[in-house]
């Protein structure tokens, strides 16, 4: 999926961002987060602006939900923007200029700009412009609540503390298994429970790692024309 973010630099450049095709609302397993999922879906489908901030220490689905929101609106022909601030070395703060004209703006990993005066001011100004226009949905993620971000600009921390704020609750091991099985089902194959529990026991339990491993096993299964079993998984993953 291609999402184009406008960079209002003197050269009027545009920056294409490729987001995962499989990170949609349908593939998100909510676990104990149905209220957050419902709030984001509601915001996406409302014709007016809104602001939601959600955070978690572990990551665990923050980017997935932003990607899903972008996918939902971009498929409807709306202009959306996704800015991963953990990769801000590839951007300039001016990337945020003009984003209040978009239907949706997603800011990922805002904790990464703490202490960066230029980025903090650019984010503060964008927030104010979005509030003034009243048309743009704004979704922001962080690794902690807004007041704990150690931002150098107190007014930005104050702004981020307005609106709807959620903690993204981590999945239990049983929920991670169900999330893996859901992802497998959407990709057209079955993940047996014993294989899923084996993966949870032997691998890093971080969901992105688990999903990447699931993709690897899917490809290997197709190539070898074999179903997923524990012996086959051990062979492919050298466990």
Swiss-Prot record:
Domain of life assignment: Bacteria
List keywords of the entry alphabetically.
DNA replication, DNA replication inhibitor
| Record-level GO BP terms | DNA replication; DNA replication initiation; negative regulation of DNA-templated DNA replication initiation
The protein's matches in HAMAP family, at most eight in alphabetical order, are given as: Hda
Q: Tell me what this protein is called.
A: DnaA regulatory inactivator Hda
Report quaternary structure and partners.
Answer: The active form seems to be an ADP-bound monomer. Forms the RIDA complex (regulatory inactivation of DnaA) of ATP-DnaA, ADP-Hda and the DNA-loaded beta sliding clamp (dnaN).
What biological function has been recorded for the protein in this entry? Mediates the interaction of DNA replication initiator protein DnaA with DNA polymerase subunit beta sliding clamp (dnaN). Stimulates hydrolysis of ATP-DnaA to ADP-DnaA, rendering DnaA inactive for reinitiation, a process called regulatory inhibition of DnaA or RIDA.
Q: Which family does the UniProt entry place this protein in? A: Belongs to the DnaA family. HdA subfamily.
Q: Which PANTHER family match?
A: CHROMOSOMAL REPLICATION INITIATOR PROTEIN DNAA, DNAA REGULATORY INACTIVATOR HDA
């Amino acid at each position: 999926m291609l999402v184009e973010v406008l960079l209002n630099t003197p050269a009027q450049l545009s920056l294409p961002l490729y987001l995962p095709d499989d990170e949609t609302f349908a593939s998100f397993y909510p676990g104990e987060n149905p209220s957050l999922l419902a709030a984001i879906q509601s915001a996406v489908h409302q014709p007016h602006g809104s602001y939601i901030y959600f955070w978690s220490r572990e990551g665990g689905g923050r980017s997935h939900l932003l990607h899903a929101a972008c996918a939902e609106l971009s498929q409807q022909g709306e202009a959306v923007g996704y800015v991963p601030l953990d990769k801000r070395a590839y951007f300039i703060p001016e990337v945020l200029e003009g984003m209040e004209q978009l239907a949706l703006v997603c800011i990922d990993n805002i904790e990464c700009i703490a202490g960066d005066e230029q980025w903090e001011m650019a984010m503060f100004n964008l927030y104010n412009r979005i509030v003034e226009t009243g048309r743009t949905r704004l979704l922001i993620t962080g690794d902690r609540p807004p007041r704990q971000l150690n931002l150098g600009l107190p007014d930005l921390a104050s702004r981020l503390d307005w609106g709807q704020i959620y903690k993204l609750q981590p999945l239990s091991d049983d929920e991670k298994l169900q999330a893996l099985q859901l992802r497998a089902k959407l990709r057209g194959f079955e993940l047996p429970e014993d294989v899923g529990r084996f993966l949870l026991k032997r691998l890093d339990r971080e969901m992105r790692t688990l999903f990447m491993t699931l993709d690897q096993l899917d490809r290997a299964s197709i190539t070898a024309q074999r179903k997923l079993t524990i012996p086959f998984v051990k062979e492919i993953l050298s466990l």
